[in-house]
Amino acid sequence: HHPNPKTSGGARWNYLAAWAWALKQPAGNDQKAKELVAAIFRNVPVLDSGARGSTTTFVERGLGDVLVTWENEGILAVNELGKDKFDIVYPSLSILAEPPVAVVDKVVEKRGTRLTAQAYLDYLYSEEGQQIAAKHYYRPTHPTVAGQYARQFPKLKLVTIDDTFGGWQKAQKTHFADGGTFDQIYLKK
C-alpha cells in the first residue's frame, strides 16, 4: 500500500527513496529506477491521500501485501497490533527525510512571538526534544539520543534530496508535476 505522491509529501519521500535505491544499484540509472518504481506502483491497489490513511487501509482494512510508509508508522503498527502481524523491512539505502520546520518571519512579527517560536524550534533539536521524538518512534538526530536508541533504529545508508535529485524544486518538476515521471508511470497502470 502506498499514499499518493501527488497529494502526500510523505509519499514523495517514499517514491524518491525507491528511485534513489534503484539509482545506487550496480548499473543503476534513471531508466532502471523508473522501471522499479513503475513495478512498485503496479502493485498498489489504492492510493490514499496520505501516510496515515495508507497505514489505516493496510492495517485495519487488510488491503495490500506491503505498506510503504514512514518508519514511525511501521513501528507504531507493529507495537499496537503485535510483531506476529507485520514485519518491518528496511532497505539497504533510503532518503534522509527531514520535513521542514521554520519560523515564519511575517507571522511572528505580526504576533510578537518570535522568541517563543524560535525557542520551540530550538527545543525540537535539543536532547530533551529528541528524547520525546524517539519515544514516539521518530529517528533522532541528536548524537546522544541516537546512541541510546540505536537498537530501535537500524543503521541505514541515507542519501539526500539535494544530492540525489538536485533539490526539491527539481524533483517536483521532474517527478510530480503534471506529465512528470509519476504520471507516466501511474497513468499507464
Predicted features, each with a name:
Residues 1-20:
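A conserved helix-loop-strand patch within extracytoplasmic ligand-binding domains
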Residues 1-5, 41-45, 106-109:
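Second-shell loop/turn segments in exported
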Residues 4, 71, 136:
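Short secondary-structure boundary segments
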Residues 7, 20-28, 107-117:
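Short helix-loop capping/hinge motifs at secondary-structure junctions, enriched
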Residues 16, 20, 38, 56, ...:
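Solvent-exposed, polar/charged alpha-helical surfaces in well-ordered, non-transmembrane soluble domains
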Residues 20-91:
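Ligand-binding pocket segment of bilobal, Venus flytrap-like solute-binding proteins
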Residues 97-101:
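Small-molecule pocket liners
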Residues 106-189:
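Extracellular/periplasmic juxtamembrane helices and adjacent flexible linkers that interface
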